[in-house]
From Swiss-Prot:
Methylated by PrmC. Methylation increases the termination efficiency of RF1. The gene is prfA. GO terms for cellular component: cytoplasm. The keyword Cell membrane does not apply. Belongs to the prokaryotic/mitochondrial release factor family. Gene3D superfamilies: 3.30.160.20, 3.30.70.1660, 6.10.140.1950. It holds the Pfam family RF-1. Disulfide bonds: none annotated. It comes from Bifidobacterium longum subsp. infantis (strain ATCC 15697 / DSM 20088 / JCM 1222 / NCTC 11817 / S12). Keywords: Cytoplasm, Methylation, Protein biosynthesis. The keyword Hydrolase does not apply. This is Peptide chain release factor 1.
């Protein structure tokens, strides 16, 4: 049988068809959370199923052409063409079967923190926030600022945002599939606006990213007894009050010590719900890290401290140059990158990751 060569693909096809049946049932259609989860898995299997069906078709067509080749020169020619095409089709299927990051289709929580460099580092953190916001807009994603502390000069001390796709994207088009490579220390070299001598200064900002958990994510269960919740007044630039009510929330998960601050929603209830979702996302990331402790997952390559030596990328303004130190990607279009033209940089990381996964499969 055809599926004996790729049993994993045959199993994926069966699951894919089963999910399609479930998604058509009234019970699932009326449950958005269930529909979203099934849709994510459906999209994840789609690439495998598509490659598998193509392989089956080429195999069947080749067998038919070979059977008729002795009687018809056209079939003989077709058999040669299909025989040459088959290895490439098989390779695409093998690649599709390489396990993806199960979180690729998820949305993403991102934190940007000013590091060494004082006010200049805060201004650069603001530049990164604008860069990611504009990149998200180009991808058709939404950006929701969940908490933000700014400086009097318009810099960003720290900010937390949620980047979300519309609908249920295929894993390769998910927010996490691209944004997971942004975690680490980003270094900037430029003449600060506060520098009167025209000297180039080096400063840094740290970026931490983790996949966003679903509101009803059953992978993570939080006991209310494990939560400490503090309520305080929201504050803006320079400590100014955002509103006159105590609506901001600080949520601490006692077993792990993880703390989440949320103040940008309109009410305390909304801030509590948003904080809980971010906390679940952090715990989900921690769980996945523990499960993949032997592999180089996202947290292993992210910020351990905001020291400039742990850089993953350098933004050199005098030369209009950007360098990704993990892939040796280099380009002289920094102005465009900061305006959201980030895809080529991210693609270099995706390609390096795919090459590593291919090598590990062999």
């Amino acid at each position: 049988m055809a599926d004996e060569q790729f049993p994993a693909a045959a199993t994926a096809l069966e699951e894919y068809q089963s999910i399609e049946e479930q998604m058509a049932s009234p019970e699932v259609v009326s449950n958005p959370d269930k529909l979203r989860k099934l849709g994510r898995r459906h999209a994840e299997l789609g690439a495998i199923v598509g490659a598998y069906k193509t392989w089956l078709q080429v195999k069947d067509d080749l067998a038919a052409a070979q059977e008729m080749a002795g009687e018809d020169a056209d079939f003989a020619e077709e058999a040669k063409r299909l025989e040459a095409e088959l290895p490439g089709v098989e390779e695409k299927l093998r690649t599709a079967l390489i396990p993806r990051d199960p979180d690729d289709a998820r949305d993403t929580i991102m934190e940007i923190k000013a590091g060494t460099g004082g006010e200049e580092a805060a201004l650069f953190a603001g530049d990164l926030l604008r860069m990611y916001t504009r990149y998200a807009e180009k991808r058709g994603w939404s950006v929701n600022v969940q908490s933000e502390n700014t400086t009097e000069l318009g810099g960003v001390k720290d900010v937390q945002i949620a980047i979300r796709a519309k609908g249920t994207p295929a894993p390769e088009d998910g927010v996490w599939a691209s944004m997971k490579y942004e975690g680490g220390v980003h270094r900037v070299q430029r003449i600060p606006v506060t520098e009167s001598q025209g000297r180039i200064q080096t400063s840094a900002a740290g970026v931490i990213v983790f996949p966003e958990a679903d509101e009803d994510d059953d992978e993570i269960e939080i006991d209310p007894k494990d939560l400490k919740i503090d309520i305080f007044m929201s504050s803006g630039p320079g400590g100014q009050s955002v509103n006159t009510t105590y609506s901001a929330v600080r949520m601490t998960h006692l077993p792990t010590g993880i703390t989440v601050n949320m103040q940008d929603e309109k009410s305390q209830i909304q801030n509590r719900a948003a904080a809980l979702r971010v906390l679940k996302s952090r715990l989900l990331a921690m769980k996945h890290e523990q499960e993949a402790a032997e592999a180089a997952d996202m947290r292993h390559s992210q910020v351990r401290s905001l020291d400039r030596s742990e850089r993953i990328r350098t933004y050199n303004f005098p030369e209009n140059r950007i360098v990704d130190h993990r892939t040796n990607y280099k380009a002289y279009n920094l102005d465009a990158v900061l305006d959201g033209d980030l895809q080529a940089v991210i693609d270099s990381d995706i390609q390096a990751d795919e090459a590593d996964r291919l090598a590990n499969q062999q």
